């Protein structure tokens, strides 16, 4: 999940250093080839993405994200309510390249675009949505299901406006954020997504921004109401454990050409050496002692087309 620029000032001013807990990938889950411009640590003499350079040490909390969701280990919770989504297309403001993903931001001073229900006690206002994707269609999602990953993952980021005065405060506190995760899989052309894809040539470079009004992101949601939920963190600095994750079970279909347009974006500003914006996902984190709850019974069959994680790493352009 991408953190807003306004959090960078908070992060840089944060006192003290937090402990690092080394992430270890289980042997049965070989590592995906994550771009070292986006990962949390340095290897093979590759530089970190600038987003991570202001972090002295990565916090070693026990509620970090993303995770691998084990279908049969998730616990059905009959008390989970249906998730209610109400977005006002008029609150959509613009789309911009922040050097890590592209974000579509929304006006959030009122409750015009909110979610409620599900595992949430309060209304949460929509702040922005963005995507994570891979260099090829075999991987790209941050979360995985039974060790399978998807070509891309959509994150719709909301904040608790009942308990907090602004997004920046909510992003640093427990139960401050609610993020809906939606997997993207290869399939038919997505007509509504294409409206967004058509803007991408205008924001190829970092910091480019264009107006993008009257868009309802619920058109990017699957029709199936089923979801998993767990307590986790931001997947970019400051990695605060402030997120209630709501991961939709059913993916949405997009075609290969639409994903290829994502890959035309750049991490870099105009005039700098070009670095393709691909593999902008964080490595999987340990589940630790957390429980992943589901809103559906386990007699469902996983009706998704996903790629198994590759057994060997490949270099990213």
Swiss-Prot record:
GO terms for molecular function: carbonate dehydratase activity; zinc ion binding. Mitochondrial carbonic anhydrase that catalyzes the reversible conversion of carbon dioxide to bicarbonate/HCO3. Inhibited by coumarins, sulfonamide derivatives such as acetazolamide (AZA), saccharin and Foscarnet (phosphonoformate trisodium salt). The lineage of its organism: Eukaryota, Metazoa, Chordata, Craniata, Vertebrata. Keywords: Lyase, Metal-binding, Mitochondrion, Transit peptide, Zinc. This is Carbonic anhydrase 5B, mitochondrial. Residues 1-33 form a transit peptide. The keyword Glycoprotein does not apply. Its cofactor is Zn(2+). Residues 37-296 form the Alpha-carbonic anhydrase domain. The keyword Mitochondrion applies. It is found in: Mitochondrion. Belongs to the alpha-carbonic anhydrase family. Zn(2+) binds at residues 130, 132, 155. Substrate binds at residues 235-236. Its EC number is 4.2.1.1. It catalyses: hydrogencarbonate + H(+) = CO2 + H2O. One of its GO terms (cellular component) is cytoplasm. Strongest expression in heart, pancreas, kidney, placenta, lung, and skeletal muscle. Not expressed in liver. One of its GO terms (biological process) is response to bacterium.
């Amino acid at each position: 999940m991408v953190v807003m620029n306004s959090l960078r000032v908070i992060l840089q001013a944060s006192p003290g250093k937090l402990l690092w807990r080394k992430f270890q990938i289980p042997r049965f889950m070989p590592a995906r080839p994550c771009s070292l411009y986006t990962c949390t640590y340095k290897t093979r003499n590759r530089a970190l993405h600038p987003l991570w350079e202001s972090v002295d040490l990565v916090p070693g909390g026990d509620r970090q994200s993303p995770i691998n969701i084990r279908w049969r280990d998730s616990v059905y919770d009959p008390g989970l309510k249906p998730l209610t989504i109400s977005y006002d297309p008029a609150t959509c403001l613009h789309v911009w390249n922040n050097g890590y993903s592209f974000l579509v931001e929304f006006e959030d001073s009122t409750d015009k675009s909110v979610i409620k229900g599900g595992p949430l006690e309060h209304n949460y206002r929509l702040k922005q949505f963005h995507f994570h994707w891979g260099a090829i269609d075999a991987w790209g999602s941050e979360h995985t299901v039974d060790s399978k990953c998807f070509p891309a993952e959509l994150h719709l980021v909301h904040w608790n406006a009942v308990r907090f005065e602004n997004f920046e405060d909510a992003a640093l506190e427990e139960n401050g954020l609610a993020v809906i995760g939606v997997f993207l899989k290869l399939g038919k052309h997505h007509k509504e997504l294409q409206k967004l894809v058509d803007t991408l040539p205008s924001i190829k470079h970092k910091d480019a921004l264009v107006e993008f009004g009257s868009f309802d992101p619920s058109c990017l949601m699957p029709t199936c109401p089923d979801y998993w939920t767990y307590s986790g963190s931001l997947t970019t600095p400051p990695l605060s454990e402030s997120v209630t994750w709501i991961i939709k079970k059913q993916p949405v279909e997009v075609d290969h050409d639409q994903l290829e347009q994502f890959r035309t974006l750049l991490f870099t500003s105009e005039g700098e050496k070009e670095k393709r914006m691909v593999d902008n996902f964080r490595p999987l984190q340990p589940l630790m002692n957390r429980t992943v709850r589901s809103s559906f019974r386990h007699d469902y069959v996983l009706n998704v087309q996903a790629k198994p994680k590759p057994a060997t790493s490949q270099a990213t352009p």
